Each structure stands twice: as C-alpha cells, then as structure tokens.
C-alpha cells in the first residue's frame, strides 16, 4: 500500500 506522509514523501507500509 502506497501512502504519503505529512512531508509529502512517498513510503510503503
């Protein structure tokens, strides 16, 4: 699942 954190940097959980 692809999510975007508050810093607008993509990361995968």
From Swiss-Prot:
One term under GO cellular component: extracellular region
Keywords attached to this entry: Pyrrolidone carboxylic acid, Secreted, Vasoactive
Domain of life, per lineage: Eukaryota
The protein's role, per its UniProt record: Smooth muscle-contracting peptide.
Pyrrolidone carboxylic acid modification, residue list: 1
Any one biological process term the GO annotation gives: blood vessel diameter maintenance
Name by which UniProt lists this protein: Neurotensin
Signal peptide: none
Subcellular location: Secreted
Secreted keyword on record: yes
Family: Belongs to the neurotensin family.
């Amino acid at each position: 699942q692809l999510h975007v954190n508050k810093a607008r940097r993509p990361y995968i959980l």
